């Protein structure tokens, strides 16, 4: 059994849900609740994409976050498939900034997904 990793109270996970990352992708947005650094970005598929990988561009107030886009691969696609990215350079955000997740490239009808940003209070 794996041991759970503990997170300090200064680390918060904020999530948004997209109704489709497949043939008709829908971008989703998160409001940043406090001054922070962006530690990790993840996507969890709630269905199986087909044909091609899903590329997920992530931006802070419209500017790409370093290391973006990341990929949810079609290989092994299925419900609960997780893809994640750690920014290649520190990215800092202020309260009320916006983080956007823009999926593209995958196919399959109405494949929902949940996007999460792991934020560490400054």
PLM feature spans:
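Terminal beta-strand-rich extracellular "head" domains
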Residues: 48-95
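Exposed beta-strand and adjacent loop surfaces of beta-rich binding modules
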Residues: 38-40, 53-55, 69, 112-114
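Extended, low-complexity, turn-rich repeat/linker tracts enriched in Gly/Pro/Ser/Thr and Asp/Glu
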Residues: 45-53, 105-111
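Cysteine-clustered segments with highest specificity for TGF-beta superfamily mature ligands
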Residues: 93-105
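Extracellular and analogous surface-interaction loops
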Residues: 27-37, 89
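Short, charged beta-strand/loop "edge" motif centered at a coil->beta-strand transition
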Residues: 23-30, 44-46
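C-terminal interaction-tip segments
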Residues: 2-18, 23, 106-122
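A short beta-strand element within beta-rich, extracytoplasmic domains
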Residues: 36-47
